[in-house]
Amino acid sequence: MNIVDSNCTIWHKARNSKFRHIVWPIRSYELTKFIPMALLMFFILLNQNLVRSLKDSFVVTLISSEVLSFIKLWGEMPMGVLFVILYSKLCNIMTTEQVFRIITGTFLFFFTIFGFILFPYKEFFHPDPELINQYITVLPHLKWFLIIWGQWSLVLFYIMGELWPVIVFTLLYWQLANKITKVEEAPRFYSFFTLFGQTNLLFSGTVIIYFAKSEHFLLPLFAHLNDTNEILLKSFITVILLSGLICLALHKLIDKSVVEADKNIKFKNQRTDILKLSLIESAKIILTSRYLGFICLLVMSYSMSINLIEGLWMSKVKQLYPATKDFISYHGEVLFWTGVLTLVSAFLGSSLIRIYGWFWGAIITPIMMFVAGVIFFSFTIFENHLGNIVNTLGYSSPLVIIVFIGGLWHVFSKSVKYSLFDATKEMVYIPLDNEIKTKGKAAVDVIGAKIGKSIGAVIQFISFSIFPNAVHNDIAGLLMFTFIIVCILWIYGVKVLSQYNNKMIQN
């Protein structure tokens, strides 16, 4: 055997080794599908992280954390329901690829309008603050609704920012992934989609910290502005628009190179994969499906558990970092470390799902969130009794420790969500037929997520409406009790759904 044949044999053995399939299970001929989808996830999630940091920082520092529950209940939930109706109507008259581009373009258009028109001229578009204060004096129990009215453009930006991950990523992106990914490819593809997509957490965290500083490369474009918040917003929106345009270009590439290559049959200038069932017919299928019901339980549980902690955590962060620039810089640091842990979790998660199965990949998220959440609530509730611990650790106040623990909770919960929860949730859709994958998925992912947030928001809404001067600290015990119940139901849902999923795969 000559040297060339020997090298070829070694290369062949390396490519087909067990180690190679564990570390990199993607085959060469699959890269034309895998790479564009991974890049598309990267830029969609880049926008998601930038918008999330903006909306949280601006709303919490310029309004308050207590208003979040009112926005989630009375803003996000109705908008989510309206979207499902609109989405189903659009799916009946055009292809899902066209729907992706229309909806993504609408989001980018709104972000542009908000960043360059609504926020810079908010004094013109918003009602007089003195008028709002007068109404609050007369109607104290409607205080937070009046505050929302007084800052309506900022609230609308928050709602659109919340809908981006649910609609563009969870629904539209994963719908495309489910459409072009085969059942045997899913265990290998999905965790690595997440791995490559979530590397943007490191990038976006760095970008956020960079633009939160006084000097950055876009500053000359806005040198004439005096408002630091306006400069910050316009800089971020510029990056978001560029990233959004890249998303549209990548989606067009995937549509032409993958979707059309697999399905190019046309009849009367219409794609044969356009859905024709009505929303009512779709709802009947969803309501009679226990399988979809348990998927919805998982989505609701995650959304609700996040909602129960998030407001309290942000209220603590605001106490420590009251300035918008400092708040968003802290958010960037949390995102960066979330990215680090996500990369580690993605490598481990891919092997975990392939070796031990769907159940163990899905059960880690609720268990980790439960443990970290209970620790955070406990430290918050007993904040006034942490003096000795604070002095021992050398910190200036218990608030520093609580914010640190809250940051750890966020890092752990988001990293396992990105690396395991999203992938395992999408895997259970694959055995379903096309109708359930599209309209059924829309109802579960959009309405399910919003109902989960709304249930958590109802508790806070009622508390803050009855006691207008209350803050998150005052209801921490109630939030902790509800959080524990939700996590227990979540774990039960994973167990039952695992049994259903195994039966469907076997059939």
From Swiss-Prot:
Membrane disposition: Multi-pass membrane protein
Gene Ontology molecular function terms on file: ATP binding; ATP:ADP antiporter activity
Principal location: membrane
Record's keyword terms, sorted: ATP-binding, Cell membrane, Membrane, Nucleotide-binding, Transmembrane, Transmembrane helix, Transport
Record field: transmembrane: 31-51, 67-87, 99-119, 130-150, 154-174, 192-212, 231-251, 292-312, 333-353, 357-377, 393-413, 451-471, 474-494
One Pfam short name: TLC
InterPro entries noted in UniProt: ADP_ATP_car_bac_type (IPR004667)
Keyword Cytoplasm set for record: no
Record has Cell division as a keyword: no
Gene Ontology CC terms: plasma membrane
Cell location: Cell membrane
Biological role: Provides the rickettsial cell with host ATP in exchange for rickettsial ADP. This is an obligate exchange system. This energy acquiring activity is an important component of rickettsial parasitism.
PANTHER family the record matches: ADP,ATP CARRIER PROTEIN 1 (PTHR31187:SF1), PTHR31187
NCBIfam families, sorted: AAA
Entry's family note: Belongs to the ADP/ATP translocase tlc family.
Protein name: ADP,ATP carrier protein 2
Organism of provenance: Rickettsia typhi (strain ATCC VR-144 / Wilmington)
Encoding gene, per UniProt annotation: tlcB
